[in-house]
């Protein structure tokens, strides 16, 4: 019986496979986003599970930068967005995807959202499905450039 339990546990771990590594430099593919986006957004990601560091650069009329530090173990992290808003986030793995619960504090209001990150196109694209109270569902696609 013990051998059966061990075999099931080992098989279950093998079936899940390795978790995605989001490390790299990613450029937003405006045409693939839904709804379509404009602007020039780049993510530089360092991912050494459970640590995840995301540097966002958005170029437009004004260039903006943001640095977020997360852990993938469900611990809450606090960061400041490119627009100066405060974010409280937690992230956990679920079915090989990274699931974020986010609370944004904007003008004293608490706005809740969530994101699901996954790699697609054999790891060449990062897909972020974002659900927010004010904007509904958005799908952001980033293409690996490095």
Segments (PLM) and residue ranges:
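Serine/threonine-rich low-complexity intrinsically disordered regions
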Residues: 1-2, 21
């Amino acid at each position: 019986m013990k051998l059966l339990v061990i075999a099931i546990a080992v098989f279950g771990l093998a079936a899940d496979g390795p978790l995605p590594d989001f490390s790299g430099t990613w450029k937003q593919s405006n045409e693939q986003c839904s709804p379509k986006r404009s602007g020039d957004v780049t993510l530089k990601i360092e991912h050494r599970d459970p640590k995840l560091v995301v540097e966002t650069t958005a170029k437009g009329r004004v260039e903006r930068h943001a640095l977020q530090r997360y852990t993938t173990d469900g611990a809450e992290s606090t960061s400041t967005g490119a627009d100066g808003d405060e974010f409280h986030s937690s992230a956990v793995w679920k079915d090989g995807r990274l699931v974020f619960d986010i609370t944004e504090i904007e003008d004293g209001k608490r706005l809740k959202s969530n994101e699901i990150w996954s790699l697609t196109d054999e790891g060449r694209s990062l897909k972020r499905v974002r659900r927010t109270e004010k904007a509904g569902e958005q799908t952001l696609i980033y293409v690996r450039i490095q």
